[in-house]
Design a protein with these regions (language model features):
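The canonical Cys-X-X-Cys-His
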Residues: 45-60, 111-115
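Blade/loop signatures of beta-propeller domains
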Residues: 149-215, 357-364, 511-517, 580-581, ...
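Short, conserved, GDST-rich strand-edge loop motifs in beta-rich repeat architectures
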Residues: 329-335, 339, 397-419, 556-584, ...
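Electrostatic cytochrome c docking/interface patches
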Residues: 25-48, 99, 171
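Repeat-blade elements of multi-bladed beta-propeller folds
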Residues: 187-191, 223-245, 268-292, 315-338, ...
Length: 706
């Protein structure tokens, strides 16, 4: 199999594991003293090598016409002193070319063991993905051939390669000041900065030239559900990919700078995440096996790795917030007793505190669970990252509802069934975990209409005066504005599609559901809007401080809750079914601009295919988002008019971002269908099939000729 010279040089020998073998692949036999299972693994490695690798690398591993030597100084110049687990990871990910991971895990372990042995090492135990043993030492500088490849003559010198930009030269630590007010060219945190606004002041791309956007570069990501919003810092893009792989790319060209591949245990299913976080010289990652890992932002090497305490039977879908030197992470769960938010020191990884998102007996708020014991209290998941207000010094987190609706539906006399802290905003002091205040947006949620989403911090005109506020909305399309310092209620804006809230207290903001729409086994079927899988949902909003306008997309769907004699999706005894609204015109995608000072919708744009990506706003009056029909588009912030669109080879699944490198502005989208909006909603548009092959990629656009 012919492969490019660049690939041969990059791998320093490992280049073509995986073509049909043309030889026996005889390798040096090991001397006695090895454990029988290790001898068996080496024998298996020779068989696998002969079958898959020898045709390119030579039967004796010394190289062939198309691939280099896998033993000796040239090979060890690249792989000497490296943990065998990294060699295993490389082979597993990259070999055979174009088919990485297609061999059994035992084959990859056997190949890594063979390469260790052929380079003078002695396998101390069976080699696997997590082996701690290292390769033999690298040769002294100058003793290894510069290329180490067969089939290349030194008759004529190679021309000089184009110079590569060192994006990490002069790296300076990321500070709280940077995260709270990022430089225009950077996208440093989820929603760009700690304010959670999803807004960039960059001005090169405008309503007048946005039609000239075209692909600047693209990079494949591991196939699978991918919804993480990339980060960009000084020309480096960081992306979390499926299977807990993290990438650093040159943000101007897409050239990979490094990759981290988490070796997950067999019982840990890989989960998509919404974000990763930068702090100091570290990139903080929440893993699917419920660890927090700090990677060196320049190399991808782990700086610390700690398990999240009290995380059994939880999952990590959101992503970390790092503020005031503290890493915070929320977890999702339906376990007894509810879920948690955990905190760690950003420099050392030392655990600082846990907070129970379901109030416990005897604790503040513990008397709001209908007299239930702790073990019978459920929910309070946190599957979205938080925000941080540097003015108040408070970290702001949203909490979801409880699926266990039955035990709290009907009030026990003398009790309270609000169910704190479900559907609440929590304001913490990051270093201590002190809960400074909370505000519950929707008490006793019987419909799975979470308020767990982003907390947007901004200054909005209230009674003619600017006021520091927090804005957030639930699935029902109601957006509350509360005071950033105290959590006191200010106002609610309504997107206009919910049908079950009949009153909102103007002083407290408490919402009153229509009692006729309370679902249960003892009642008739209930029809209401929106559906828990529709409405405003996983895709976050964007906010323009200068115009007091919040931009949000939603899905115009409703639900029928049907009673069951036994069981049910909700423990109140009902199953949930999707439905179109009674007066639907078949346009299920909604995009709105909401005046948060007036509490009114300024404009609305509708389309057939539901939106799937979050919203990005820019200082030139543009909005970017994406939809289920594999389309990304730009709109005018003032009117909602569509100005540009482009097709992609996958469903845009994360929020778009924008950044600049060397004076050129880029807009990036991540594909990789997998957030919950892809469940159920495609049935509303059967003529728009979702991709059968779930690939993932980063697509980066820029203006032609810039």
């Amino acid at each position: 199999m012919r492969i490019g010279l660049a690939g041969l040089l990059a791998t320093a020998g490992l280049a073509a594991l995986g073509t049909g073998a043309a030889g026996t692949g005889a390798a040096a036999q090991q001397s006695g003293g090895l454990a029988p299972q290790v001898e068996q693994q080496l024998a298996h490695g020779r068989t696998v090598f002969a079958r898959n690798c020898a045709a390119c690398h030579g039967a004796d591993l010394t190289g062939g016409q198309f691939a280099g030597s896998l033993k000796g100084p040239a090979f060890l110049a690249r792989w000497g002193d490296v943990p065998v687990s990294q060699l295993y990871d490389y082979i597993h990910t990259s070999m055979p070319p174009g088919g990485g991971g297609t061999l059994p895990a035992a084959d990859y372990g056997a190949l890594a063991a063979l390469l260790l042995a052929e380079n003078g090492g002695t396998p101390a135990a069976l080699i696997a993905a997590n082996s701690a043993q290292s390769m033999p030492p690298a040769p002294p500088p100058g003793e290894a051939p510069s290329l180490g490849l067969p089939g290349i003559t030194d008759r004529y010198p190679f021309p000089a390669s184009p110079p590569l930009v060192d994006r990490f030269a002069g790296y300076t630590p990321v500070t709280e000041a940077m995260l709270s007010n990022p430089a225009p060219e950077n996208w440093l945190a989820w929603r760009r900065g700690h304010m959670g606004q999803g807004f960039s002041p960059l001005a090169q791309i405008t309503p007048g030239n946005v039609r000239n956007l075209s692909i600047a570069w693209a990079q494949a990501l591991p196939a699978g559900a991918t919804m993480a919003e990339p980060l960009v810092r000084d020309g480096v893009m960081y992306v979390f990919g499926f299977g807990d792989q993290v990438f650093a790319f040159d943000a101007a060209t897409g050239r990979q700078l490094w990759r981290y591949n988490r070796q997950l245990p067999e019982d840990a299913a890989p989960l998509s995440k919404k974000t990763i976080a930068l702090w100091g010289d570290k990139l903080i990652v929440a893993t699917s096996d419920l660890h927090m890992v700090a990677l060196d932002a320049r190399t991808g090497r782990p700086a610390w790795d700690v398990a999240i305490p009290d995380s059994a039977n939880t999952r990590s879908n959101g992503g970390p917030l790092v503020a005031d030197g503290v890493v915070m992470i929320g977890l999702a769960s339906q376990r007894d007793g509810g879920s948690i938010i955990a905190a760690f020191d950003a420099e050392s990884g030392a655990h600082l505190w846990n907070f129970n998102t379901v109030a416990q007996e005897g604790a503040p708020g513990g008397d709001t669970w209908n007299n239930l014991p702790n073990a019978a209290r459920h929910g309070g998941s946190v599957w979205t990252s938080g925000s941080y207000d540097a003015e108040t010094g408070l970290a702001l987190w949203g909490v979801a509802q409880t699926y266990d609706t039955g035990p709290v539906r009907d009030l026990v006399p003398g009790s309270n069934n609000d169910g704190l802290y479900t559907n609440s905003t929590l304001a913490f002091v990051p270093r201590t975990g002190e809960l400074r205040w909370y505000y519950q947006h929707m008490a006793n949620d019987q419909y799975d209409l979470d308020w767990v989403f982003e907390r947007v911090i901004g200054d909005v005109s209230v009674n003619g005066q600017p006021r520091r506020v927090i804005m957030t909305g639930g699935k029902e399309g109601l957006f509350d504005t509360i005071d950033a310092a105290t959590g006191r209620y200010i106002d609610t804006a309504d997107m206009g599609f919910q049908t079950f809230i009949t009153a909102i207290d103007p002083v407290t903001g408490r919402k009153t559901p229509d009692p006729a729409l309370l679902p249960g086994r003892d009642r008739d079927a209930v029809f209401m809007c929106p559906h828990a899988g529709g409405g405003r949902n996983w895709s976050p909003s964007a906010f323009n401080d200068a115009t007091d306008t919040l931009f949000i997309n939603a899905r115009d769907t409703c639900m029928e809750l049907r009673p069951r004699a036994e069981g049910g999706f909700f423990t109140s005894g009902v199953d949930v079914y999707f439905s179109a609204p009674a007066d639907s015109d078949g346009n299920f995608g909604i995009l709105q601009g909401i005046d948060m000072a007036a509490g009114e919708v300024r404009w609305e744009h509708r389309r057939r295919a539901p939106y799937n990506a979050g919203v990005l706003a820019t200082g030139t009056g543009l909005l970017f988002t994406g939809a289920m029909d594999q389309t990304v588009m730009a709109y005018d912030q003032a009117t909602g008019a569509e100005l540009w669109h482009s097709g992609l080879n996958g469903v845009p699944n994360a929020s778009p971002i924008t950044y600049a490198v060397d004076g050129r502005q880029y807009v990036a989208f991540v594909t990789g269908m997998g957030n919950p909006l892809a469940f159920g909603l495609p049935n509303f548009t059967p003529e728009i099939p979702l991709p059968e092959v779930n690939s993932a990629a980063v697509y980066v656009f820029a203006l032609d000729g810039e």
